[in-house]
C-alpha cells in the first residue's frame, strides 16, 4: 500500500518535515517514491510554513494512496490558506 506521510528532517530541536509518497512498509525517514512538499512547524511570520503540489497530490490520491491523519490536517490547513 502507498501512503502519503511526513518524513522528518532538520536538526535537533529544529524539525522540518517533507511530505512524501512512500510504501507503507518503509521506515519513516527511509526511501520514498516522490516528494510532494514540505511542512515547517517553526516557520516565522515571513517564512512559508507549508507547501504542497496539489496536482501531484490529486494524482496519488486517484491511484489509491492514503494520507496519514496528520497530512490530512495539513492539507486542509493549506487549502484554507490558499482560499
UniProtKB/Swiss-Prot annotation:
Keyword Ribonucleoprotein in annotation: yes
Molecular function as annotated in GO: structural constituent of ribosome
GO biological process: translation
GO cellular component terms, semicolon-separated: cytoplasm; small ribosomal subunit
Top-level taxon of the source organism: Bacteria
Family matches, as Pfam families: Ribosomal_S16
UniProt keyword annotations, A-Z: Ribonucleoprotein, Ribosomal protein
HAMAP family, sorted: Ribosomal_bS16
Family: Belongs to the bacterial ribosomal protein bS16 family.
Designated name of the protein: Small ribosomal subunit protein bS16
Lineage: Bacteria, Pseudomonadati, Pseudomonadota, Betaproteobacteria, Burkholderiales
Gene expressing this chain: rpsP
